[in-house]
Amino acid sequence: MALNGPQKTVVQLVSVVVVMGGLAWASVPFYDWFCRVTGFGGATGVAEAGSDTILDKTIKVRFDASKERGMPWEFRPVQTEMELRIGETGLAFYEAYNPTDRPVAGQASYNVAPYSAGGYFDKIACFCFEEQVLQPGERVQMPVTFFVDPEIVNDRDAKYVHTITLSYTFYEIDLPEGYAALDAGEKTNTN
């Protein structure tokens, strides 16, 4: 069946809209994958264990914390910076406090600056890998274990980096189902 002019135009326009919608839907997971693979945008790597190679060259790591507007927690790095040898495993802590009278769940997102160092900053363990739930008045110290990959000294851009900033932003999220039921139960009066 041959399409006449207006029908052909409609089919082409619908096809363009469908393709654009598909590309928009796929762009978020693709961009996430791209950033993790290349370190673009300050995305960091994840490692199972520390580096086998430790260089004599040192690098300073600064720690930064922020929170989304409306997130009721207090959130800060326990120490603001540390200096370690490239390849050496570092351990830093961030502190979170829930000053409210209700449980609050949060999820941390992170990045590394400068962006050229993102692909060489490897986390072994991090509180950002899972959701956090703080009870009313609860204060916790959350660890992050990391190292700077010795391959950074071979990168034409990143080898000149002397300071890396690890930054976390906490966002409030919905309470997990079990916590929501507990919170609702605490608010009901029973005799």
UniProtKB/Swiss-Prot annotation:
A GO molecular-function annotation: copper ion binding
Compartments it resides in: Cell inner membrane
One Pfam family it belongs to: CtaG_Cox11
Transmembrane segments: 10-30
Cytoplasmic side: 1-9
GO cellular component, one term: plasma membrane
GO biological process: respiratory chain complex IV assembly
Database matches in InterPro entries: CtaG/Cox11_dom_sf, Cyt_c_oxidase_assmbl_CtaG
Record topological domains on the Periplasmic side: 31-191
Family of the protein in this entry: Belongs to the COX11/CtaG family.
HAMAP family: CtaG
Function: Exerts its effect at some terminal stage of cytochrome c oxidase synthesis, probably by being involved in the insertion of the copper B into subunit I.
NCBIfam families tied to this protein: PRK05089.1
The protein, known as: Cytochrome c oxidase assembly protein CtaG
Species of provenance: Ruegeria pomeroyi (strain ATCC 700808 / DSM 15171 / DSS-3)
Source taxonomy: Bacteria, Pseudomonadati, Pseudomonadota, Alphaproteobacteria, Rhodobacterales
